[in-house]
Structure formats: C-alpha cells, structure tokens
Amino acid sequence: ILILNQQTVTAYLDKGNEVQVALVDFTFKTKKLLFATNGFANELTKGAVHPARAQVLITESIQNLVIKGAFHLDKGYYYFRNIGDRILLGGGRNLDFEAENTSEFGQTEIIQKKLEQLLKEVILPNQDFQIEHRWSGIMGVGSSKNPIVSQLSDNVYCGVRLGGMGVAIGSLIGTELADLV
C-alpha cells in the first residue's frame, strides 16, 4: 500500500483493469483508488463537500492539569481536550463563516484571540499557560451531516464529508470504505 500525503490529484481515469492517476509532479497506475481528502473533495463530489478551515492550538505542559477528557462548547463550535498534561483547543469558525469557508491553511486574529480568551476565562481560569503551537486543518462539510462513503466507478471510491467530526468518526468511515473495496 502506498500512501501519498499532500498531493494534488489533477486527473484520474478508471480504465477497468487499472486507474491512471495524474498528480502535479508525476503520474502512476493502481488497481484501486480511494480518496479520503475530505475538505478537498469538492470537485470529486460535484459540490457535495465544501471546505471549512478549523483553527487549532495546543498549550505547553501545564503542571497539575486536572482537565481530563474531550469537551464541546457553544453548539460544538469550540472543542477542547487534554493531551497528557496539555490542552488542545480548536474552533471558532462561527465568528467568520465566510472567511473560514476556505481550503487555505492559516490563522486569523479574531479566532486566535477568541481561543486564547476561552483558555484564560473558561477552560484554565487563574492558571498560567503558554501556547506551544498553532495550526489549521481543512474539514469537509455539506448540506447533509451524513458522510459520503461511495463507489465512484469500478475501481474508484471515496470516504469524505465528515462534517468536522473526522477525529471522532474517521476510523469508522475508513472501515466502511475498506468494506466497499
């Protein structure tokens, strides 16, 4: 099994006995092709999946961290969990849906400030912390909350539109996709 990350598929052709796949820098042939691109699946699904940026941060180690588990705030627009003795916090796209409906990676001041405010005032009040790292990911969302797990042609399949729940349901969708093959 060959897994290619951070590649852009420019075209593919299912020829019945093989699939030809063209990437930006090279092409290859395979017997089966499975797409799990999620937020980058708009063209693949004829518009059924749209990108939505998710901004995330993680703290440095926090002495005597008592928070354990995974939590959601504000109708799920914010989510946090402990990772060992650190807090991972993400969300806030509801502050600027238009700007966050993008496939561009990056952070915005309005969302990063809100994430820091939540850490200071709600999640870790009266506790010192430092932010170690910030990043973003691209989720796949659509008009339906149901994921798309389907066969696109004889040898091409997709498992996409996880609706921001990729970490929670990604393994299940992967199993369903494998069962199709």
Predicted features along the sequence, with ranges:
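A conserved beta-strand/loop element that lines the FAD pocket in flavoprotein oxidoreductases
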Residues: 1-9
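Hydrophobic/aromatic beta-strand patches that form the interior of the parallel beta-sheet core
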Residues: 4, 34, 157-159
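Short glycine-/acidic-enriched loop or helix-start segments at secondary-structure transitions
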Residues: 44-46, 99-100, 168-169
